[in-house]
Design a protein with these regions (language model features):
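C-terminal binding/interaction regions
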Residues: 5, 9-10, 88-144
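A short beta-strand-loop structural module common to alpha/beta enzyme folds
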Residues: 27-38
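Helix-adjacent hinge/juxtasegments
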Residues: 44-84
Length: 144
């Protein structure tokens, strides 16, 4: 299960990604928002991040206009490594080297087709472990 959330600026892209993943047989749990009415991204980003951190969802996708605010929010939740990506290479490398468990995107930065490629790359790339695990452990130790 994939946690997904957005604010008003990311609502349309969130709905597009939900439909795209559903067509591929991937289930999403939507943590809001449910319209383009102005709202506060920390509310929705936090809810999705908590679902990933608790194990309720395997990974998460969060979207706002730039992706910046909602990624900062998600990264405040212990156990979350949320990467803001605007290209497939970043999505690949953050999974391979950082074991990112959440993806943030900016709806004003990436269009639907690019977002699909970024999401596919993020969800289908495995963590390499090895020397990268040591680095992820050092990051995680900072949360204590």
């Amino acid at each position: 299960m994939i946690a997904i959330a957005s604010d008003h600026g990311g609502y349309h892209l969130k709905e597009h990604i939900k439909a795209y993943l559903a067509a591929k047989g991937i289930t999403c749990q939507d943590f809001g928002t449910d319209s383009t009415e102005s709202c506060d991204y920390p509310v929705f980003g936090k809810a999705a991040a908590e679902a990933v951190a608790s194990g309720q969802c395997e990974k998460g996708i969060v979207i706002c206009t730039t992706g910046i605010g909602i990624s900062i929010t998600a990264n405040k939740v212990k156990g979350i490594r949320c990467a803001l990506c605007a290209d497939s290479l970043s999505a690949e490398m953050t999974r391979r080297h950082n074991n990112a468990n959440m993806l943030a995107m900016g709806a004003g930065i990436v269009g639907p087709n690019l977002a699909e490629r970024i999401v596919d790359t993020f969800l289908n790339t495995e963590f390499e472990g090895g020397r990268h695990q040591r680095r992820v452990d050092l990051i995680s130790a900072m949360e204590e």
